[in-house]
């Protein structure tokens, strides 16, 4: 059976995620200490199967949304790869870049799913932005409860959290703008030619 390239990219992203999670959870390397890898080991694989499970439960309407699945899994892979390479502790701007880029990727995935519906561009923009804002808040709450409240980072957590929320929201808005433009283009139909 011939599989599209997107299938193999999707499998590669998920395989890399699981492999790096195992390294983070079981290697004993210093860069994973205090980073809530037990929680990541449980929640990240669940996040990686949201699209396939939802697609299956929704009746498997073809084609499979590979783009959405890849976009929704990539932020988790980027996070774990950044920890594996010790980038959060060795590059001062890495965490900030991740909040922008990962929320752009996450929201692009949600946008790809919305493009499969009849929702108009303005609603797409609002839903993608809202999803990004809510998930950024939930992420920061999870960070606080899993490792910040009992760490040396607590003293600077408020300022860092505000910056992370702003960057996550900005990434969400960028993804929402692109997705709304794609929805508008799809509504307009093919260009005369």
Segment roles from a protein language model:
Residues 101-118, 125, 148-152, 169-183:
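Membrane-interfacial alpha-helical segments at the cytosolic side of multi-pass membrane proteins
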Residues 1-16:
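N-terminal membrane topogenic signal
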Residues 39-41, 62-75, 95-101, 123-127:
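Cytoplasmic-side transmembrane-helix entry/capping segments in multi-pass membrane proteins
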Residues 86-95, 137-173:
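Interfacial helix-loop-helix junctions of multi-pass membrane proteins
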Residues 52-55, 75-82, 108, 131-143, ...:
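Alpha-helical transmembrane segments of multi-pass membrane proteins
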Residues 33-52:
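Loop-to-helix transition at the N-terminal end of transmembrane alpha-helices
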Residues 29-37, 84-94:
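Membrane-interface helix caps and helix-loop-helix hairpins in membrane proteins
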Residues 3, 32-36, 54-67, 117-123:
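Membrane-interface helix-boundary motifs at transmembrane edges
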